[in-house]
From Swiss-Prot:
It comes from Schizosaccharomyces pombe (strain 972 / ATCC 24843). SMART domains: PAM. Disulfide bonds: none annotated. This is Protein CSN12 homolog. The lineage of its organism: Eukaryota, Fungi, Dikarya, Ascomycota, Taphrinomycotina. Gene3D superfamilies: Winged helix-like DNA-binding domain superfamily/Winged helix DNA-binding domain (1.10.10.10). Belongs to the CSN12 family. Residues 232-416 form the PCI domain. GO terms for molecular function: double-stranded DNA binding; RNA binding. GO terms for cellular component: cytosol; nucleus. It holds the Pfam family PCI. It comes from the Eukaryota.
Amino acid sequence: MSERPLPLNVYFSTINSAVARSNSVLLAKNLSIPWGKTLTSVLNFDIPGTYSSDDVLKLTVERSISKNWTDIVLLHLQVLLYLVRDHDPAAAFKQQTELAQHLYREFSSGRCTGVHLPVLFIVCKDLRFLAINAHNAMLRRKQQLKVISVDESEENEQLEATARLINRAFTICINDRAPLSTSRKWGAYYIMGLLFKLYLRLDCVHLTNNVLRAMKVVELPDISLFPKSHVVIFHYYLGIVAFLNQNYKNASAELEIAFSLCHKGYNRNLELILSYWIPTRILVNHQLPTKNLLSKFPNLASVYIPLTRALKSGNLGEFGKCLQKNETLLAKTKIYLTLEGTRDLCIRNLFRKTWIICGKSTRLPVSVFQIALQVAGTDLPKLHVEAILANMISKGYMRGYISRNFETVVLSAKDPFPKNVST
């Protein structure tokens, strides 16, 4: 059964009530695009004239809405009309940019304060969604027309424009000098999250440095005073940026904080954190995910249960097959190369098993490790095997040295395969 549309006069009354009571959460809810619903069921635009004529709609809004919010409400309704009536995501996006710019002016003038941050959040959030919609619609249109883009910057025009606009919102938040009770600084971490999402989508990780530097310069309230969801956003994106910069120790630390603070009922968010935290823990701490943990996240389990099995057993063949099977997904999330880096751990476990089978001797011929690699499905010449052994020793996966005169690996008598290796 479809939801009954909300009559426009009831909608106006709700807006005015929210403004009068300074209920910014309710105001934000009524200025949001209800993406999960059929847009045609949101508002009843069938009041005579309002659907067919933008001029009549403007007049209706001006007569019905509190003065300071007239333009914002009108722009929001026009965004909905572009989506519902015209099916034009590009026009809807353009109108939302006007809405955002108008709202920024309200904040800059002081008519909007930190009390109105929920409205800023939803306007910026919808702006990002509309930019993605407009971007995807443009790509589909070009594909249908078989147009090849020469200028890549033109292809990302909406996303880049949105990043600049949301960066302005971030500046509005961090540069506020009002008392903390009404400060816009409370919006810094949420807006930072939206901005980082866009930078990562645009593959412009370096731009996150400017944001982080700005956050260090200004005096923000202690992070423990912010909503927990904002703190999770902050640590999650710090972890992702560190991960993409191959600073895996910092990434692991930040993602651990994000995971510990994230609400345990938000499985999707937990899965996003784990999708980066698990590979960093494997690489940095050699800690493999447990079956109990993976049982709660089927998507992760399909990748990491076979991968964990291969790593533990030193089965290079299965390790390679697992990466190959999930290559598209892992490459898309930029995790593939990190997991490829855990191949050394797989080799270490294979060589350790070989050492145990050979009675834990401190002297083993290079040919023994060559045979072990052959059994694991990797047939290599002896010189290549020596290079792998040298790499294992230099990285700390093995303790010992190679005696080339005797083609022998001389292992340490004490803990020749240490568990904790700095990477």
